[in-house]
Amino acid sequence: MRIAKLIGRLSVFVCVLAGLAAGVVAYFGIDDGKPSVCFGGVVGGHLANGKRLPLSGPNFSAYHIAGYLTGRTFMHGLARDAVVDAYKALQQSAPEQRYVYAEAGWPFGGPFPPHRSHSNGTSVDFMVPLRSDRGAMVQVPASVFNKLGYNAKFDDEGRGANGLRIDFEAIAQHLLALDKAARGRGIKINRVIFEPSLQRHLFAAASGQALPQRVTFMDRAAWVRHDQHYHVDFAIPCK
């Protein structure tokens, strides 16, 4: 009986602590209308006046409600606006597509475990669009049991579990729209990190053939495999 009570009290304490932590993040993430200012680089930097990505829209959604509520989807305002603008453009050019964005950063930037970067508000991850073996649009399965989708695995041909495969054409359309949207905001994409073995499939897609001339890709493997998501760094002047 005592052990059961102790476990119950501990559970309540953990829930309260988690709620307080989420409240603190939400407080610092309140949009006061001031422009964002980034400091330093994607590693070791920080951010003032971060702006939160919308939870969802007509053709996009956040990767998981837990990540959204705990404040892991904040960016520099110009980058956030470019991301949203790209989704709006894709509503017209590719109305059938659905996209999922993933982690960006804290409202105030700084260290963002388990990521090595994402510290100054200029970085964001996007989950790869998928197709089922019947051609239906599917999103990367995300739950607390697979690191909110980051533990999903795809081979060098873009094939995953249960007959799922990466939709490279949808990725190419998104990156071209994001490049155009960023330029429209007076910024640009600095680089894209996507698993090197998958880049050849991306560039072979109908819309992907234009990507190498428009967007810079990191040509070596990152410290973790980027197969279930692609990482985008924006070039924004920082202090």
Where are each of the predicted segments found?
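Short, surface-exposed glycine/acidic/tryptophan-bearing loops
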Residues: 115-129
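Membrane-interface motif at the C-terminal end of an N-terminal transmembrane signal
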Residues: 17-35
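N-terminal Sec-pathway targeting helices
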Residues: 1-17
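Short, conserved acidic/polar surface loops in the N-terminal third of protein domains
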Residues: 110-115, 136-140
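Catalytic cores and adjacent binding grooves of peptidoglycan-active enzymes
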Residues: 28, 134-239
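Extracytoplasmic
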Residues: 94-96, 119-123, 187, 227-229
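Extended, low-complexity, intrinsically disordered C-terminal regulatory tails
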Residues: 82-113, 191-217
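Active-site acidic/histidine clusters and adjacent loop/turn architecture
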Residues: 36-101, 167-177, 181-183, 188-189
